[in-house]
């Protein structure tokens, strides 16, 4: 289905059938995008394992869209490069430099 493979924004919910855990992971990852995903289940432990296998920058379990300013925001694949918010965002705005000084040199 086209809605499952394109990155659309809006209030939209796409619901799809799947046969097992491997099938749902395969379908979730079968796109060039990977901004976010949401998993809903009574089995939070299973959701946590599945979340690690989904190629998305953010995965919500039993919620969707809630976040905290200290948690990095960003996607995988064509859904963005880098992260906003949190300590990871500082790397995007920082250029690291190393300066070496020989304090024992007689000049």
What are these regions (language model features)?
Residues 1-107:
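Conserved C-terminal structural/oligomerization subdomain of aldehyde/semialdehyde dehydrogenase
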